[in-house]
Amino acid sequence: MLIYKYIYGPVNSWRLGRSLGIDPISSKRKACTFDCIYCQVGKAKSCSLKRRVFVPTEKLIKELSSIPKLNIDYITFSGTGEPTLAKNLGSMIKEIRKFRKEKIAVLTNATLLGRKDVQRELKHADLVEAKLDAPSNDLLQIINKPHKSISVKKIVDSIKMFKKDFKGKLALQVMFTKDNIAYAEEIAKIIKSIKPDEVHLNTPTRPCGIKPASKEEIDKITHHFKSLRVVSVYDKRKRKKTKPISRKETLRRRGKA
């Protein structure tokens, strides 16, 4: 039986369909620029902006090459931290392109999108989903607990800068909790200034100790985003059946399989 260290899923994603996860961090401790209150991976020992190689590209490619034939829609970079902290993220994407035909997505908190090296690497992805949970620095501290150098303005400016040259699909996710749902209109105003291709309205549905917003609460605030293409975690769409190749690794990164 093969043991997978860097790959998890595939899972049924309400955003991406059948999604096979790639974790370019794959460390026992979360490595992130945020320490979000709703993160199912757990708490970060500290937040860092330093990029480094966590998983050698050749090891990831060897593991990906060994998986059985799967019917998937996306290969998605996400997992035990912020994917753009992986210094070899670009080489991973390019090597995967050589032998896989599926679309590639990267889920990022957007804190490093202002960096030219990160922009160059992400241009090879089909979809980049950035995150914006707070319209103010006070809320950013409460919800995302970022590295001390990060501000809402820096995040928004970084996303706008990235969008200028990105040829793929840019989505923005908002994770709504009791702390920010009253600020939906303010968040929507900022997102409209960014003009993403799609907005994903989310709430913590995985085990994390934070109570999710109800379907009624999410439906109630959706009108603030009416000029944008919106997808909600509560949208009724037929989910495609999937079975993870490694239940253990999937549970470790997602809290559920």
Regions found by a protein language model. Give the residues of each.
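Conserved AdoMet/S-adenosylmethionine-binding subsite of the radical SAM
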Residues: T84-A213
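Canonical Radical SAM [4Fe-4S] cluster-binding loop centered on the CxxxCxxC motif
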Residues: R15-V55
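A secondary-structure boundary/capping signal
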Residues: D23, G79-T80, T108-N109
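Short, basic/glycine-rich phosphate-binding loops at helix/coil junctions
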Residues: Y38-A44, N71-Y74, A134-L139, L170
